[in-house]
Amino acid sequence: MPKMKTNSAASKRVRVTGSGKLMHAGSAMRHNLEHKSARKRRELKADGVLATSQSKNMKKLLGR
């Protein structure tokens, strides 16, 4: 039986933690940062945990 391919688009967008949770980078940090406060930029820098309903589908794409 051949190896299952992971979806490369999905693997670039999330990372799996040691406990199996999926982390994703936040949006709104690419440009126009001069209009955001330092506090807002700090908050947006942190990675978010993917919702369980989405992580179920994402794990299928990652082959887990």
Swiss-Prot record:
Polar residues: bias regions: 1-10
Pfam families in alphabetical order: Ribosomal_L35p
Keyword DNA repair: no
Signal peptide: none
GO molecular function, one term: structural constituent of ribosome
GO cellular component entries: cytosolic large ribosomal subunit
InterPro entries linked: Ribosomal_bL35, Ribosomal_bL35-like, Ribosomal_bL35_CS, Ribosomal_bL35_sf
Name the record gives this protein: Large ribosomal subunit protein bL35
The family this protein is said to belong to: Belongs to the bacterial ribosomal protein bL35 family.
Name of the gene encoding the protein in the UniProt record: rpmI
PANTHER family: 54S RIBOSOMAL PROTEIN BL35M (PTHR33343), LARGE RIBOSOMAL SUBUNIT PROTEIN BL35M (PTHR33343:SF1)
Record key words, sorted: Ribonucleoprotein, Ribosomal protein
Region (Disordered): 1-64
Cell wall biogenesis/degradation found in the keyword field: no
HAMAP family xrefs: Ribosomal_bL35
GO terms classed as biological process: translation
